[in-house]
């Protein structure tokens, strides 16, 4: 699983073609080992991410859906994103946040249930698209508050499953 960086939005560009070629080489190599390559959501639109996966076309690419990253980067609503690329979701982060309000900064991560991700609807939508995998709680702070937030997130998620 990785953040590849910013994916080119224009599929006819030289940069896009070069990216697809490099990703295809990598994906074919790791496919020989029975491995998958997952893109973590964030810096690109859901449509661009789906296009890249389909254009590489090796069958072993997927998505780790971090709903907060889509919001933090201002790239879309994670529930709507599932309509676009739900079939490719192979992992999920439980993380919450707010859209950016300062054009020079990312949005703000907050404890699960306190941001813009509608987790009751998000969890329902995950089931609708057939996701049955792991949900990993992610809280990018340190110390005692991180532990408290993770335990609260676990409790919230248990009520939604």
Kindly give the residue locations of the regions a language model identified.
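A structural motif corresponding to the C-terminal end of an alpha-helix
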Residues: 25-37, 122-132, 160
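Conserved, mostly hydrophobic/aromatic
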Residues: 19, 37, 66, 92, ...
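Active-site acidic/histidine proton-transfer and metal-coordination neighborhood
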Residues: 1-62
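C-terminal helical cap(s) of enzyme catalytic domains, especially alpha/beta-barrels
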Residues: 146-161
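Active-site beta-loop-alpha junctions enriched in small/polar residues
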Residues: 4-5, 35, 40-44, 68-70, ...
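A short, structure-level motif marking secondary-structure boundaries and short turns
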Residues: 10-12, 34, 66-67, 106-109, ...
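Gly/Pro-rich active-site loop or hairpin
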Residues: 69-132, 141-144, 148
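Amphipathic, non-transmembrane alpha-helical secondary structure
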Residues: 17-24, 28, 47-50, 54, ...
